[in-house]
Amino acid sequence: MSFFDWLFRKKPKQNIPQMPSWESIVEMMRYKHLDAFADEVVNVIYSQDCSMRYVILKGENGLFTYQLEAIYQYDEDEWKYICSHDNALPAMWEPFRGIVGKSVFENTNDLLKELKSEPEYKQYF
């Protein structure tokens, strides 16, 4: 094979698996990516349909905080690209509406009281 043949040869078509249903994605994503946090994960509270979660974290200083996350499903183009990687998931957890900063608490009781007063908690949990 000459250099130009090798350079301009067509790449074989890659079989792209079909995007799973939303219910399958939600089930797949449960308990995933909890190791991505720098702080210790103390508890995880899932919404009624399990598409959202509150992750309660404990920092090195002993203080607690939480983060609300929602499942982001990749679109078709993203899925085509991601499928080329091993162990690819069709979605990822991301901070809900991009909100990352939360208050810091000395104990989990105060944290849970604050968490339960949030409108997202009242609506989805």
Describe the function of each predicted region.
Residues E114-F125:
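Low-complexity intrinsically disordered segments
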Residues E40-V41, E78-D110:
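A short, exposed loop/beta-hairpin motif centered on an aromatic-Gly-Thr core
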Residues N15, Y72-Q73, C83-N87:
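Intrinsically disordered, low-complexity regions enriched in Ser/Pro/Gly/Gln/His and often acidic
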Residues A38-Q73:
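Amphipathic, interaction-prone secondary-structure segments
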Residues S2-M52:
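Negatively charged, low-complexity tracts enriched in Asp/Glu with abundant Ser/Thr
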Residues E69-A70, W79-I82, E120:
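Surface-exposed beta-strand edges and their flanking turn/coil or helix-capping segments
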